[in-house]
């Protein structure tokens, strides 16, 4: 058992992230293959060593085989059969997958069926699963879905007020994303607080960002919708807007609807408002970007207030996680101050260096406020072990 390894894979349209764990859940190596289809770049970190090299990756298969060969070359693994589990992050499982799943032909067919809902994500994820079937045939492959945690959202929160045939024929409804992160946060705080069935409002804030209302330990509502475009203002995504804008701009600019949606996904958000998609760059110019920062903060505050109301004011905590939520103290302070009328209170002195979590609410705060470091890869490892030990 000591030689057994678990690999976590996150495949995107032009990149693949890898993390290799031992069976005690310790990280052995991290790697990134990026610029697939273009010129290719490979990064590997292991045992306090770093490898960076330009490598041509004509496709995802070439990237996977290069990664596996590099693991053997540096003796991180002896044989490919050392990898007994491969956990794949899959973005879209629709409402079909209520749990993570050991991937067989039927599960793979379903993942492919949902490519139409998330073409940029599910297609490379399905392709990479098939690559691992071929390259590491002895390993079991587990799919862990961003959407699974949100399959508990009640109908009144997942339906859109559109013709019902759109849902019945085309699966148009709220799905929500970042579910693996929300599951990790919920599980972590259950252990940390020694309490089950928590009510939480969790803000996962990174370049992609969302908020989730957790009721009795289950997702009750979330800001992302049919796609990750809905909800908060993000690095390059617009978040909520009037859908009539899509048709109007398509007509005025002689663009297709999909071109407009692409612009809303990749050329909007903070990038459109400030010229920068990274919040560190935005906050480096607070006066110049004051309006954009106010818009960004207000949108997060709106969702916190909305979900506090939906949870009837009964929460065990407000949680900030993700790259911004975990690290940008000035940003988190703004979010909390924007909802201080609801009883939330913080003090910058509480924003000290911390390990996995810290409390940033003052004794005067009506509700506890936490910062918790999420770990989606560890959640995927734990799900993979759980399923294969059944």
Swiss-Prot record:
Query: What family does this belong to?
Result: Belongs to the acetokinase family.
From the UniProt record, list the coiled-coil ranges.
Answer: none
Which residues are recorded as binding substrate? Answer: 89
Q: Where along the chain is the active site annotated?
A: 146
Pfam family example for this protein? Acetate_kinase
Full protein name: Acetate kinase
Q: Which InterPro entries match?
A: Ac/propionate_kinase (IPR004372), Aliphatic_acid_kin_short-chain (IPR000890), Aliphatic_acid_kinase_CS (IPR023865), ATPase_NBD (IPR043129)
Per UniProt, subunit arrangement is: Homodimer.
One GO cellular component term: cytosol
What gene makes this protein? ackA
**Record PANTHER family:** ACETATE KINASE, ACETATE KINASE-RELATED
The pathway noted for it is: Metabolic intermediate biosynthesis; acetyl-CoA biosynthesis; acetyl-CoA from acetate: step 1/2
Q: Which organism is it from?
A: Mycoplasma pneumoniae (strain ATCC 29342 / M129 / Subtype 1) (Mycoplasmoides pneumoniae)
The residues the record assigns to binding Mg(2+) are 10, 376
Note how many cofactor molecules are bound and how. Mg(2+). Can also accept Mn(2+).
């Amino acid at each position: 058992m000591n030689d057994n390894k678990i690999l976590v894979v996150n495949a995107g349209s032009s990149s693949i992230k890898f993390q290799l764990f031992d069976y005690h859940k310790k990280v052995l190596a991290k790697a990134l293959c990026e610029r697939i289809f273009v010129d290719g770049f490979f990064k590997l970190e292991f045992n306090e060593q770093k490898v960076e090299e330009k490598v041509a990756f004509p496709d995802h298969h070439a990237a996977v085989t290069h990664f596996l060969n590099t693991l053997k070359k540096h003796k991180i693994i002896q044989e490919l059969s050392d990898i007994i589990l491969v956990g794949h992050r899959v973005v879209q499982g629709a409402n079909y997958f209520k749990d993570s799943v050991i991937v067989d032909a039927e599960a793979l067919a379903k993942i492919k069926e949902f490519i139409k809902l998330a073409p940029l994500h599910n297609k490379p994820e399905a392709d990479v699963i098939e690559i691992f079937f071929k390259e590491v045939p002895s390993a079991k492959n587990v799919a862990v879905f961003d959407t699974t945690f949100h399959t508990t959202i009640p109908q009144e929160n997942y339906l859109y007020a559109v013709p019902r045939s759109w849902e019945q024929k085309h699966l148009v409804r709220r799905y929500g994303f970042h579910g693996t992160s929300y599951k990790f946060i919920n599980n972590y705080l259950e252990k940390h607080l020694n309490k089950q069935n928590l009510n939480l409002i969790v803000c996962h804030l990174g370049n992609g960002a969302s908020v989730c209302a957790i009721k009795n330990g289950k997702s009750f509502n979330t800001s992302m919708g049919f796609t990750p475009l809905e909800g908060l203002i993000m690095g390059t995504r617009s978040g909520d807007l009037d859908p009539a804008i899509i048709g109007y701009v398509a007509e005025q600019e002689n663009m297709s609807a999909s071109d407009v949606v692409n612009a809303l996904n990749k050329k909007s958000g903070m990038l459109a408002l400030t010229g920068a998609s990274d919040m560190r760059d935005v906050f480096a110019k607070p006066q110049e970007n004051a309006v954009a920062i106010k818009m960004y903060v207000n949108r997060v505050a709106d969702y916190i207030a909305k979900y506090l109301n939906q949870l009837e004011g009964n929460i065990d905590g407000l949680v900030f996680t993700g790259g911004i939520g975990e690290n940008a103290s000035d940003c988190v302070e703004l979010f909390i101050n924007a909802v201080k009328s609801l009883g939330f209170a913080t003090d910058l002195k509480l924003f000290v260096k911390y390990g996995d979590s810290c409390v940033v609410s003052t004794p005067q705060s009506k509700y506890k406020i936490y910062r918790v470091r999420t770990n989606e890869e560890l959640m995927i490892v734990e799900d993979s072990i759980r399923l294969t030990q059944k």
